[in-house]
UniProtKB/Swiss-Prot annotation:
Protein name (database record): D-aminoacyl-tRNA deacylase
Record family assignment: Belongs to the DtdA deacylase family.
Entry cofactors: Zn(2+)
Subunit structure: Monomer.
Amino acid sequence: MHLIVASRSDPASVRMLDYLTEKYTFSEKGGVLNHGDFDLVIIEDRHIFHDMSLSGKYDYLVVLSRHSSAADVKSLTAHPTGNFGPSADLGGKPRTINISCPRVMSGTLRRMMESYSGSRFEVTFEATHHGPIFDIPNYYVEIGTTENEWNDPEALSTTVDSVMNPDVRDYDAFVGVGGGHYAPKIKEYFRENSVNIGHIISKHDHDALEPWEIDMAVKRTPGCKGFIMDRKGTRGNVREMVKKYADENSLELITI
């Protein structure tokens, strides 16, 4: 079973929830709303601060969310959760990441890329960031960045339908390293090659990154076979840490 989480404190999440329940029939089952293999939970508070313990109940969960961008990037995104480095201003804990969901998160983004044919939105990964704390594999799906986008019918159908029908493929999973928040080179490599992506360590987290956090990213990317590294978008100290870790653990290192 899978779990979808929506928040009434998030206007985009509310619109995604409305689309979800209008298109797909959910009925109460065991105290939660259910449609096939999906349960649905609606919370009142902000999801990034809503820690949940669900071990043994679901194989993964996905949170429906708005995306905020100071640069007003209009986007449809999927990303893992947690915090690399010492800050946890948006939920979770410092230097703590959740278990990523490479097969399903990648399958969701793959479906979004396949189904969206417009030019208004960028369909992309985001690097690992923000809370909350979960104890099962999880990912976020987001619409950015203003009310106009949160109400866009094509944005709603692309994101929600892709959550319900991800294009899941049994490809090897990799940790992404480098690039900015949207990891553009990693996204393009993903688009053109047979891989799944788990955690992504943005260059913005590289200055304070500890070597053991690389180990954590691998161990919290199920089935991880190695790294896909944006060489120019990775700081020199992190390039060396990743190379050393890959060599010592017989992991693949793909440099792009």
